[in-house]
């Protein structure tokens, strides 16, 4: 709705300005909902729309040789493009630093997520190219904080370590060391040993947004998250040791959730409570589980005995929406009593954009 109002305002105040809409989320109700671009072009609220990646289409648009289409081919080599030019930006008007993209897609295939129906392959830039862009932009604009737009900043550990090594070396002598934040996954100790956590801090990692989703291992296994509660404890302790802030992103009312799994989550929050306000800076409890079109859960619904409703949150399986909303409220109240900072209602995208200019 906000985007629509902005387009109407631009059309009214500056009718000669060209409006281009784009991105993987150019739709209502998930990646596979109604095509918002085609709808708004028909309403004359935009001149062009680009489904997903815009590096090649923007050139075609400038040359007058582009037809908006839902068909597109994913770019495999993200290192082939020059870094963004922000010369027209007044960075004093923005909070949270400069957005940067190091990868597209995701290494996980979570059951509730539709990203793999869009980004078929996880692709990433070299770690050096990411670090070089951050150094160049900070030198040019005098902005020293960066917000990653990636689904995961540590999806490729090879690229992640390479980036951290370059940034650590730069920060060790820089007058204004760089800091950065982004969405993150907890990995087992053998995949991310303590020396990598130390390196991350020295490289400028300030804040992580971690898709925990559930602190019940059985629920999380069904989600295909691929990390254990021991991995969570290890990661939280490492962040605490090196002064890295973390926001837990939670989903309440998964398809396998029961009173017992909610109880297990409460107990795990009790175990982690010594880190409330330190390495666990916030616990973001979003809406109850939404089953979006194009997700594995949507295709598994019949086998799981789920009846889909008129919207993505209104489904019936082991639980109904009334029960899930009560679980959510109970979990929030429990976390608050334990000393966690729990925003009243914050979704994943809002957590990432609070204090930044990025969208995920």
Residue ranges and their predicted role:
Residues 20-21, 50, 181, 247, ...:
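Structural detector of well-ordered beta-strand residues that form the stable sheet scaffold
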Residues 25, 151-155, 185, 252-256, ...:
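Short, solvent-exposed turn/loop segments enriched in Gly/Ser/Thr/Pro and often Arg
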């Amino acid at each position: 709705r906000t985007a629509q109002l902005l387009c109407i305002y631009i059309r009214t105040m500056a009718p000669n300005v060209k409006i281009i809409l784009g991105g993987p989320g150019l739709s209502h109700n998930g990646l596979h909902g109604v095509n918002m671009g085609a709808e708004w072009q028909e309403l004359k609220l935009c001149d062009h729309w680009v489904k997903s990646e815009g590096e090649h289409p923007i050139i075609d648009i400038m040359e007058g040789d582009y037809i908006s289409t839902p068909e597109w081919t994913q770019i495999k080599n993200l290192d082939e493009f020059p870094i963004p030019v922000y010369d027209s930006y007044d960075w004093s008007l923005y909070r949270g630093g400069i957005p940067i993209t190091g990868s597209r897609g995701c290494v996980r295939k979570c059951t509730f997520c539709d990203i793999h129906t869009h980004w078929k392959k996880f692709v990433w830039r070299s770690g050096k190219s990411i670090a070089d862009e951050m150094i160049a932009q900070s030198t040019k604009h005098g902005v020293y904080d960066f917000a990653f737009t990636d689904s995961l900043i540590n999806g490729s550990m090879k690229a992640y370590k390479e980036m951290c090594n370059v940034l650590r070396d730069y920060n060790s002598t820089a007058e204004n060391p760089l800091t950065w934040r982004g969405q993150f996954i907890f990995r087992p100790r053998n995949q991310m040993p303590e020396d990598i956590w130390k390196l991350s801090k020295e490289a400028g990692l300030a804040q992580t947004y971690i898709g925990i989703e559930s602190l019940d291992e059985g629920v999380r296994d069904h989600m295909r998250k691929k990390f254990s509660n021991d991995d969570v404890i290890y990661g939280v302790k490492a962040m605490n040791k090196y002064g890295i802030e973390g926001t837990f992103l939670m989903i309440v009312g998964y398809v396998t959730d029961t009173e017992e799994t909610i109880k297990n989550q409460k107990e795990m929050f009790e175990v982690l409570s010594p880190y409330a306000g330190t390495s666990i800076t916030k616990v973001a409890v979003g809406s109850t589980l939404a089953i979006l079109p194009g997700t594995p859960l949507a295709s598994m619904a019949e086998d799981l005995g789920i009846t889909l409703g008129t919207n993505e949150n209104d489904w019936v399986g082991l639980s109904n929406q009334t029960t899930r909303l009560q679980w959510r409220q109970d979990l929030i109240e429990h976390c608050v009593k334990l000393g966690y900072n729990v925003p009243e209602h914050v979704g994943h995208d809002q957590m990432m954009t609070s204090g930044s200019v990025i969208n995920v």
